[in-house]
Design a protein with these regions (language model features):
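Family-specific signature for flavin-dependent thymidylate synthase
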Residues: 1-234
């Protein structure tokens, strides 16, 4: 399995990966000039020890690359938490890569996330952020239609601006941004991926990014079952 569909039109695709649970164990063992050729119970105990004691550098030697297609609001939350592999040991580099499609260069038909009538959530009672229970279906139906109308109006203005000769990098100002799907490549260490999962699988994370985190988990865990089990609090 290399792809998981998320939301109405989004997805996460595993593009590539490097290493395994054995990579983590051998990265730790190199300190003693030792190496295992196959994963044993001794290696699994070592991985558990590394995770439990917070010795995270061996987990950075395994790497995953994903292609993600998600609403802009999800992408910007995701970017905030792309910090897990950052150890700043002299390079100032977070050791991650993020490359995203840009409407400065492309004018393909925009795609937008539109929640269904039974997916609109109320504001929380005792918090400034997050959400509460699902709103009544009547209200949800009204909101879905209003959002669709808003998107259609923005698209008309965007397309008209392009036809008038406006450059793509400015024409995009007419697009309703937060629900617009964007596509990016995310390459990160196993430690960074697990850090993201611990942050965004939490019950108080925004629902939409929780769904993407679950997709990342389902694609990652079969590749590094021991390491992910030990590092991620499900």
């Amino acid at each position: 399995m290399t792809m998981k569909n998320v939301l109405d039109q989004g997805y996460v695709r595993l593009v590539n990966h490097m290493g395994s649970d054995l990579t983590v164990a051998n990265a730790a063992r190199v300190s003693y000039a030792k190496e295992s050729t196959e994963l044993t119970e001794k290696d699994l105990r070592l991985i558990r020890f590394l995770a439990r004691e917070g010795h995270t550098s061996p987990f950075r030697h395994a790497v995953l690359q994903f292609e993600v297609y998600a609403p802009l609001m999800v992408a910007r939350q995701w970017w905030k938490y792309v910090v897990g592999s950052s150890h700043m040991e002299g390079t100032g580099d977070s050791l991650e890569a993020w490359n995203e499609s840009s409407r400065r260069y492309i004018t393909e038909e925009p795609v937008f996330y539109v929640p269904k009538s039974d997916e609109w959530r109320s504001k929380p009672e005792n918090s400034k952020q997050g959400s509460g229970e699902i709103l009544p279906n009547e209200t949800g139906t009204k909101l879905t239609k209003e959002l669709q109308d808003y998107i259609e109006e923005g698209l008309e203005k965007y397309e008209a601006a392009l036809e008038d000769g406006l450059c793509a990098e400015q024409a995009r100002l007419f697009l309703p941004a937060y629900g617009m799907y964007v596509r990016w490549y995310w390459t990160a260490s196993l430690q960074s991926v697990c850090h993201f999962l611990n942050q965004r699988l939490k019950h108080d994370a925004q629902k939409e990014i929780q769904l993407y985190a679950k997709a990342i988990l389902e694609l990652s865990k079969p590749l590094y079952s021991s390491a992910v089990t030990e590092l991620v609090e499900e």
